[in-house]
Amino acid sequence: MSQFNLSELNALPKAKQAAALVLVNGQLEHLTAQERVSWALDNLPGEFVLSSSFGIQAAVCLHLVTRQRPDIPVILTDTGYLFPETYRFIDDLTEKLQLNLQVFRAAHSPAWQEARYGKLWEQGVEGIERYNTLNKVEPMNRALEALGAQTWFAGLRREQSGGRSQLPVLALQRGIFKLLPIIDWDNRQVYQYLTQHGLSYHPLWEQGYLSVGDTHTTRKWEPGMSEEETRFFGLKRECGLHEG
């Protein structure tokens, strides 16, 4: 698999872009997660960044990527509404893995947003989408631009939701490369990796949380619920960071 030129690929018609990505994804599917990271660092353009929500399985991708690129910027979009356990988990992992953590936030504070818009997460799908745009999408776009990102690593997995079930290892998003090294992992592989490397799940895992985001849009799992139903009141799965 040869090196990719981002500007040349972006200049291609959509059909030719898709064909080029299909070809390389056919080969990436047969590599291990570690080999995918190594291939990306050798063949995709820098600057490289890694995003993390510091959710349930976050330690896996953080460890996997930083073993090969210790100083890679780790982007966190902090909404100001994360669980106290999440903030402590961020501190613990940042110290343990010596992360180059880069925190980006909305232009206005949570209090200012509530004064101006009310509690957007209580205003149906439209309110949730506006909340996500203000607190996640816009800060992430700003982060990618500020860090000059051309290749973006993320820890999504197909098993997590129906909307992620068809995601490829490598894609173009926001005009940059996006590589998902553990996209085909199942829960067992996540557990094995964490155990092998002395890493922990998010602290709320033991309290019955399968997915962790903001306090007001995250629910503990109950019998009969899918993982998707534990977020955003079951109205949607994605926060917008990994869409488009």
UniProtKB/Swiss-Prot annotation:
Alphabetical UniProt keywords: Cytoplasm, Oxidoreductase
Q: Which terms in the GO cellular component ontology are assigned?
A: cytoplasm
GO terms classed as biological process = hydrogen sulfide biosynthetic process; sulfate assimilation, phosphoadenylyl sulfate reduction by phosphoadenylyl-sulfate reductase (thioredoxin)
SUPFAM superfamilies from the xrefs? Adenine nucleotide alpha hydrolases-like
Q: Which Pfam families match?
A: PAPS_reduct
Pathway-wise, it operates in: Sulfur metabolism; hydrogen sulfide biosynthesis; sulfite from sulfate: step 3/3
Q: Which GO terms describe its molecular function?
A: phosphoadenylyl-sulfate reductase (thioredoxin) activity
Q: Which reaction does it catalyse?
A: [thioredoxin]-disulfide + sulfite + adenosine 3',5'-bisphosphate + 2 H(+) = [thioredoxin]-dithiol + 3'-phosphoadenylyl sulfate
Q: Which HAMAP family match?
A: CysH
PANTHER family per the UniProt record, alphabetical: PHOSPHOADENOSINE PHOSPHOSULFATE REDUCTASE
State the family it belongs to. Belongs to the PAPS reductase family. CysH subfamily.
Name it: Phosphoadenosine 5'-phosphosulfate reductase
**Source species, please?**
Yersinia pseudotuberculosis serotype O:1b (strain IP 31758)
